[in-house]
Amino acid sequence: MKRLPDDELDYPGDDGLYYQDGVPFTGVAFDRAGHGLRAEEEYRDGLSWGTVRTWHPSGSPASEKQTVAGVFHGLCQEWDEQGRLTLYEVCELGVTVWRRRWAAGVLVEDWRLAESDNDFATLQMLRKHFLRGLTELGAG
């Protein structure tokens, strides 16, 4: 898989895609800090698609999140400098459906998307349109 520094990507912004030399980028873009990585992100056809990772200045993991078609989809986790989990979140098509947060190792939030939440209707609409798109592509 192609790997390159993220400053070699162009983001014109008019279509939401990242490009390398005028072509939507597929591969891994990374950002270095000092002697190590600060961040890396997988792309497919110009969209964030795969794993997004960041590191603290010490080199310890800061976050790992999954994306599909440019939005968070799947497990999202964050850690503090001591390696303690601070966020454990599940997203679906860009909508958070479940989240736990910790501060100094103590659980401070345990939340789940409820049918009464505004984002619930958004998620239902996204599911419908996403599945329709897969069917039209012959993947569903």
Regions found by a protein language model. Name each.
Residues M1-G140:
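Glycine/tyrosine- and acidic-biased, solvent-exposed loop/turn segments at the edges of beta-strands
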